[in-house]
């Protein structure tokens, strides 16, 4: 079942909203490619944080 802004993994709970949205987008894409759920979540969070650090989102300081 794909994730959305109201239903997402607990490990994404403390991410800033913009970063969480990106992580959800990435995780759903990885699941469609056949990745295992746990691995998709870990990769998605890391990539979303990288995206934010590159200026994709305003990261709280």
Predicted regions and their residues:
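C-terminal alpha-helical interaction appendages
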Residues: 1-61
């Amino acid at each position: 079942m794909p994730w959305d802004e109201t239903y997402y993994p607990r490990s994404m709970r403390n991410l800033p909203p913009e970063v969480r949205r990106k992580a959800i987008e990435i995780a759903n894409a990885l699941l469609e490619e056949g990745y295992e759920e746990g691995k998709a979540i870990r990769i998605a969070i890391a990539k979303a944080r990288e995206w934010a650090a590159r200026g994709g989102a305003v990261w709280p300081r």
